[in-house]
């Protein structure tokens, strides 16, 4: 901004040395100038009275001149010594202007420049002072006062702008300034409405929190009194999914519909309406600022007064930047965002406080399991495993084998008193979170209306999701916490022996153990991931020694030194080491954090302590349980494998000794169906177990765990060896033989279908079945190669392919000849587009049975293409996008022409007017289609109607121009010639010129040339001699001679008939199927090309083309073109 650069204007002092002296008097006074004073003195030498008056006036002039010089020197001194005292500068400049007479234009120009410089500096200081005062008011949320203060800034440079005659848009600027003044005056009710809606929502928020707290208290009382406390209606189900698995958008949608009340909805609706009304009201001010901005851009090339006012007006209206709310627009839009932020922060703090209370409910009243007595993989371990599986089934005498551990969680009768409830507090927090999400969802769309001051509302949404994720983490931690208490209760129960049925249970069907493992591993994995997540966000200073966040009587979390020598898992050790390393950094962060950030860090630290203790206790329990699981599964697998081996031995004996059919069927049934299925299921179960147990790296170094894991690996190897015996015995050879047999049958069937299609002249169907027969035969050969079968299929498929081509080629030759004849007829009639379409159909029909092109078709296409190119643009096709508009213009032009043609000579002026309008329509058409025949001919007729005598002369000149330019500007000249020919075909010389031009352009065939006709006959005679000798090797030479004969004389019917006879007998012999070996090489070339090995593919194709028959294969030729195009 240029205002910023004018705070200290620099005025060169030497400039004043060259200023002219000030005049001695001002215009309009009775004082005299020095020359006039000399004249008075000379004329009044004898008159003493007049002489005294002259001396008095001279004294006055000298005094005035002395005051002028003193004031000027004072101005110089002030500029040098007080450069920022702009008010004093302006006062001295005003005095000098009064002392200086109007005749000294240079003095006045200099003083004007100096005044402008000082004025700009004063205005700049006032501008910055105003913006700073308004910023303070905005920080106090006194938005109306700020808007009024901003509005007063329109006075800066305003008078100078209006006084400048070159200022752009004075009227609009004056109207905009007045409108802004009135608009700010009307903002007070809207701002008051926002404040009232904000207060209403705050009161509703407080009442909602109070009601929710009352319900939570009732739920806690009910939990303490009831035998089993159910979840509160509508409460969110506890989920152990951690970290948060939903997207931000999905989580916010769920929260928005949670625990909504009518009172809150009404308050939120009122708030949104008030904010929306204020934002809508501010759009008019924003438009005013945009107008100032546009005018400022245009004024940059003009003088500085214009730019200064418009730039300041833009900043007063819109603010200086988009980073913070500023200007009148900012004062009107800031209340919306500030109201949302204040309400959001109040809700967020309430949710965080509830989470703090929930964390305080976790206590640890029992020491963790030491894990020192790990059972060995024996029957005792199996008994332990069975007892573990029965947890949660009720009393010890009514065991249900395989019941999941989680069945007992929450059953207070079996395990005694559970810890204090957390869910009521989380439900209360969820209510507040729902209200917070609805507040965000309602206000975030309004953020899009802050076009000038965009704000990141997504950050607030992320905070909501983070709070929701923290609540889910608390719920999942509570779920694991309850589960751990159930395990402690069972740990003190008597051990129950395993039942016989459970001992013999198939390994693949033991779903109960899988559920138990999944349940236990799930809780431990959750805790490990929760620790990592919590630590990454805000690691606590010392997790190991942090006391439990319970009441005063809670047992503290034991540290590493209090374990009694128990071996701890690797995950807690790792977490605590990381915590210790980050403790210093955390303390430094606390020193510079805000209170809210420190509260979040403290909450994370408490949750970290709870999760860390639970993880250590789960790890000890899980190690013993996993070892028992491995012992049980190893025992079950050994038993199952012994049974499978006995059945397989019986099957091998039955097959080896060539048993009867019944025994063979039973043996094959076991080997191909029952046995493989059972073994496959058991191997899959073992793979899952090995993958699961091998992933527990924290236990791999322990002796008992490693022994059980190795036993499972050995068992998996035995199952794999057994499976290999079964597969080797039966499946491989039988499966391959079946596929080969099916492929041969399909090949034979397709061959018969192709023969039937040929007999019915269904050439397309015959060719399709022929190709399918080749594919199936190749498939059979790939399964088992048979030289005799390969030779047989190659021979008969090739023979059938030739028969199909030969029979169909006779029809192709006739059809092509008919297409060529029709095309020639259309060409002679001038219907070149239809002729071109017929020749294209002939070309496509020829390609059905021939690989090489038909020379006659190619020659005619080259002839007709020239005529088509010259015809393009003469007629507007009905499918053209502008066809309706162009047709309407031409029709209107023709109607005007016809109307003008019926007028008599006395109506000459009206006729010229109509023809001028018609010519305008014609000009519009010619701009798009410059060669259009209707427009060109109508333009010529208008010229003819206006001046028939001059038109005859112009007609002759145009013909002369065409005669001289048709070889260089062929298309334009030929189009004009056709228009002239349509106007007057009898004009002298036009017919001859038309024939000359068309023959030159190839549109018309030249008249018969006796020499060409004779040469054509000679070519025909030479070709006939070859045909009569039945020399098939030279038939292609004969066809080339006949093509040349037809090119020289298109009406040579003898050449056309002879060519058709030769081609009907021989054809091009297009090949549709290759031999089995060539097809294999063709497929290899395709694969190499797809891999990018273009040179290898090209070499394979060239090798294929060494055979004459393959040169006639369309697909090989097409592949060669593809490869050549890429080389």
From Swiss-Prot:
- Composition bias type Low complexity, residue spans: 536-549, 583-599
Q: Signal peptide: which range, if any?
A: 1-26
Coiled-coil stretches: 1076-1126
Q: Which UniProt keywords apply?
A: Coiled coil, Signal
Output the superkingdom of the source species. Bacteria
Q: Where is this region: Disordered?
A: 533-600
Identify this protein by name.
Uncharacterized protein TP_0855
Native species of this protein? Treponema pallidum (strain Nichols)
